[in-house]
């Protein structure tokens, strides 16, 4: 049965890709994907033939009825109706809508759909989460809220997208355009006016790119291990893996202090002490700035390379913080403003050699911009701003669908490592929530598609008289109440 009664549109039905079948010893027949299975009971001979037809290629409803009727007689007609209804409801069928023999669009299910509505969508507009892009097969309309993707075959469908509120304005007859609009609304690619995307917090709080990133970097509707997701090593035999060491900068190098780890094991505060004493400190001691020796110890304890192994041509390393697949794509760039024993400027931390190499002088416009971007300090920028970048190819050569999410997880564990080490050393740490990626690119000259700025961490000397912690500041603000208006 067509979703919208129309004498001009014809549906072609087929099983969605990557669907498998299995029969249990008791005769129950199952359809399954990697993450979902459904029993179809014990299908008749005609139903089995219909399933084979659907797995082979697209068929019209009438063609499938004829196949079932030939084997099962009148019972086959009733049986195929039940079977197709179950397959539709379970999201097993992709549905191609045709007009005068030409394919308009295909609904490609990702999960079971909601029941189709026979009501017309009121003043529809394109969902703010919908995205039209090109893939290997053509144009694809997607949304993280949709139960299906919509494959666009005919350019006339695009004219309907541009005139959803006026079906007669597009390149298709109004009756056909209504079918396209119905499918867009059913798939949540289009929404009525007014719509919950603007009025409900649960939807309004998500920006399109954030919801897209969340939905596509987690397993679920699109992501299945081995199917363009996970550690697939997709680039093997196509591109060379990136080396563990990045291309060095041309500036002068400065060897850093190496602490005695054996002594630190004896004298450092306990893990519990560090975790309980950890706090964000934004006010530095400008009279007694951080020293080059302290920065050297900090970087050694947080981010040095502890060793490298090569496996099947890929270099894997080890650092004090964990990293997925031992890829260690993160690089640290200390931007020094005020540190005893160091000239102001942007440096790259060469973790394999434990040394700094000058990238740009502190007077460079991009370095100044980087230092002053979104810094939540009442008394100016920190003494050292640790800019963290990601050589994304270290991860993306192996992983699909999830590598940038891994980058952010790695930033998180590096932040915690930095907080703990700074606390143990008596320094003032502050993880920042935002930074200027373009300024990093301008300062370093790196290609942002190969290495991009992803995080910033402020590090300074700790003041003798420490400011109140965040909870104390918020509590004091609450007791004071809102600011009074000036009469």
Tell me what each language-model feature is.
Residues 361-411:
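A mid-sequence, solvent-exposed acidic-amphipathic segment
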Residues 188, 302, 306-310, 422, ...:
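A generic secondary-structure signal for well-formed alpha-helical elements
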Residues 346-348, 385, 454-458:
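Conserved hydrophobic/aromatic beta-strand scaffold that supports enzyme active sites
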Residues 205-207, 212-381, 479-487:
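N-terminal amphipathic, basic helical "cap/leader" segment at the start of enzyme domains
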Residues 1-265, 276, 423, 474:
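Long, charge-rich, low-complexity alpha-helical segments
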Residues 453-487:
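C-terminal helix-cap and adjacent tail motif
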Residues 298, 332, 386, 392-394, ...:
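Small-aliphatic-rich amphipathic alpha-helix that forms the alpha element of a beta-alpha
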Residues 442-449:
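Short proline/glycine-enriched turn/loop segments at secondary-structure junctions
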């Amino acid at each position: 049965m067509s979703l919208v009664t129309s004498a001009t549109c014809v549906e072609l039905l087929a099983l969605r890709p990557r669907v498998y079948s299995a029969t249990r010893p008791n005769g129950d027949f199952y359809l399954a994907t990697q993450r979902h299975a459904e029993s179809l009971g014990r299908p008749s001979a005609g139903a089995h033939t219909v399933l084979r037809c659907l797995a082979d290629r697209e068929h019209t409803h009438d063609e499938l009825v004829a196949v079932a009727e030939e084997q099962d007689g009148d019972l086959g007609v009733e049986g195929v109706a039940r079977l197709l209804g179950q397959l539709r409801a379970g999201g097993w069928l992709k549905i191609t809508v045709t007009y005068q023999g030409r394919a308009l669009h295909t609904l490609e299910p990702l999960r079971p759909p909601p029941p189709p509505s026979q009501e017309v969508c009121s003043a529809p507009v394109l969902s703010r989460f919908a995205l039209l892009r090109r893939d290997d097969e053509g144009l694809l309309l997607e949304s993280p809220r949709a139960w299906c993707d919509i494959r666009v075959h005919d350019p006339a469908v695009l004219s309907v997208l541009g005139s959803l509120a006026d079906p007669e304005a597009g390149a298709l007859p109004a009756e056909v355009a209504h079918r396209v609009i119905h499918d867009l609304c059913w798939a949540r690619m289009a929404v009525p006016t007014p719509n919950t995307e603007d009025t409900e917090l649960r939807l309004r709080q998500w920006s399109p790119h954030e919801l897209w990133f969340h939905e596509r970097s987690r397993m679920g509707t699109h992501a299945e291990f081995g199917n363009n997701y996970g550690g697939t090593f997709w680039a093997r035999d196509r591109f060379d893996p990136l080396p563990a060491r990045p291309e060095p900068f041309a500036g002068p190098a400065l060897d850093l202090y190496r602490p005695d780890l054996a002594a630190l094991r004896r004298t450092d505060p306990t893990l519990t002490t560090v975790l309980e004493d950890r706090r964000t400190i934004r006010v530095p001691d400008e009279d007694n700035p951080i020293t080059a020796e302290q920065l050297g110890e900090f970087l050694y304890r947080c981010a040095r390379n502890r060793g490298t192994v090569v496996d099947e041509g890929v270099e894997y390393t080890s650092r004090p913080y964990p990293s997925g697949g031992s890829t260690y794509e993160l690089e640290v760039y200390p931007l020094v403003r005020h540190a005893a024993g160091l000239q102001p400027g942007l440096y790259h931390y060469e973790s394999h050699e434990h040394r700094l190499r000058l990238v740009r002088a502190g007077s460079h416009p991009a370095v100044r911009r980087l230092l002053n971007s979104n810094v939540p300090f009442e008394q100016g920028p920190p003494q050292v701003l640790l800019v963290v970048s990601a050589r994304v190819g270290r991860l993306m050569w192996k992983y699909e669908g999830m590598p940038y999410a891994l980058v952010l997880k790695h930033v998180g564990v590096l932040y915690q490592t930095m907080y703990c080490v700074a606390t143990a050393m008596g320094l003032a740490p502050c993880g920042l929530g935002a930074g200027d990626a373009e300024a990093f690119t301008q300062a370093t000259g790196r290609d942002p598609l190969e290495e991009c700025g992803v995080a910033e961490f402020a590090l300074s000397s700790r003041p003798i008289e420490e400011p109140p912690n965040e909870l104390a500041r918020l509590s004091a603000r609450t007791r004071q109440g809102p600011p009074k208006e000036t009469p």
